[in-house]
Amino acid sequence: MEKSVNVIGAGLAGSEAVWQLVNRGVKVDLYEMRPVKQTPAHHTDKFAELVCTNSLRANGLTNAVGVIKEEMRMLDSIIIEAADKASVPAGGALAVDRHEFSGYITDKVKNHPLVTVHTEEVTTIPEGPTIIATGPLTSPALADEIKQLTGEEYLYFYDAAAPIIEKDSIDMDKVYLKSRYDKGEAAYLNCPMSEEEFNAFYEALVTAETAALKEFEKEVFFEGCMPIEVMAKRGIKTMLFGPLKPVGLEDPKTGKRPYAVLQLRQDDAAGTLYNMVGFQTHLKWGEQKRVFGMIPGLENAEIVRYGVMHRNTFINSPTVLEPTYQLKTRNDLFFAGQMTGVEGYVESAASGLAAGINAANFIQEKELVVFPTETAIGSLAHYITSASKKSFQPMNVNFGLFPELETKIRAKQERNEKLAERALNAIKKVAEEL
């Protein structure tokens, strides 16, 4: 009997995974619960519905999200094909007519002879090769199944992420390397603040604008993970006993203890990204740039991933997933989309593309593909499966995830162009070998 793959969820990741499978001659059983059962965020019965913005972000190759889109074009992505066809004027970004976009994908996927669509809710994970791409609003019944499969402690229901900064953009003359009380190796970059600097920062923080919660996010639980601005409003000294505690962090240049200290912790294996410890936040992105830019050393900080707190269902990928998007404990089960800890429309589709290719290779008994880390697709897969297990949070694609160039280039645009060129050369080789 001819083998088929189950794909659960017809969002961006699921639709892309289906497309990659059928392009390789694999039959697909696609399960989508809408419109029989709607989520609080969706409004149509279309596949790959865009529930938030209609922008797929930058299109140029000096931006990592532009590079990942180009890689996907080279691998016959239906999501990018649909976006190009449904594009609307948006300067340097790729924005789409959302109805035309999802209509195009629905039509192509639904009417493909190798696809059988089942309009029903899946509450148990089926046997046999399967891709789970059920997104941030996965139904409670299926979430329970996933929890049992991955382990209770490895499934999360909301993001609470602090901003992540590119190391090259930190003013190293103003910060110092040290661990609290000099315990272990000096692993943190420390941003010292005088009382005057702290007071100005505090005032800006407590008066900054926060992002509005969407209706379906109102139940987000913040216990044990309080936004920094909420903590600050509890009193001017509260942060000094929390994330900005200066005790044990004397400045080696002066030998004195600063009034307040923000610690930055290395976020990736290459040491190119640092996160702001304890600074999970719900501030608007522009406000994050303005307010956090008042901290000494971060005046010109490039934030590659803004702090967020929102409803999201995702697994601890560094613990449970392979870079092929396979579950470590069950090799015929793949995950794709935001559930894996990739963040954003394009990133979700890219993970679906990789999972689809690998599920096809699995069923056809071919070698699975680990995308090179020099590629945008590969750098993202590498990050979500190798980041810190203890503090794993979802991530957008960005150049900070890419391995450094052999020759260091200081000019940012030129460096990004070289990273893009290297990525596209690498993906070309992958495409030729598929």
UniProtKB/Swiss-Prot annotation:
Annotated GO MF terms: flavin adenine dinucleotide binding; tRNA (uracil(54)-C5)-methyltransferase activity, 5,10-methylenetetrahydrofolate-dependent
Pfam family, one: GIDA
Record's GO cellular component terms: cytosol
Cofactor section: FAD
Protein keywords: Cytoplasm, FAD, Flavoprotein, Methyltransferase, NAD, NADP, Transferase, tRNA processing
Enzyme class: transferase
Alphabetical GO biological process terms: tRNA methylation; tRNA wobble uridine modification
Record keyword Ribosomal protein present: no
Reaction catalyzed: uridine(54) in tRNA + (6R)-5,10-methylene-5,6,7,8-tetrahydrofolate + NADH + H(+) = 5-methyluridine(54) in tRNA + (6S)-5,6,7,8-tetrahydrofolate + NAD(+); uridine(54) in tRNA + (6R)-5,10-methylene-5,6,7,8-tetrahydrofolate + NADPH + H(+) = 5-methyluridine(54) in tRNA + (6S)-5,6,7,8-tetrahydrofolate + NADP(+)
Gene3D superfamilies per UniProt: FAD/NAD(P)-binding domain
Keyword NAD appears in the UniProt entry: yes
Classification via InterPro entries: FAD/NAD-bd_sf, MnmG-rel, MnmG-rel_CS, MnmG_N, TrmFO
EC number, as in UniProt: 2.1.1.74
Binding of FAD, residues: 9-14
Compartment(s) of residence: Cytoplasm
NCBIfam families, per the entry: gid_trmFO, PRK05335.1
Protein family: Belongs to the MnmG family. TrmFO subfamily.
Physiological role: Catalyzes the folate-dependent formation of 5-methyl-uridine at position 54 (M-5-U54) in all tRNAs.
Name by which UniProt lists this protein: Methylenetetrahydrofolate--tRNA-(uracil-5-)-methyltransferase TrmFO
Gene (name only): trmFO
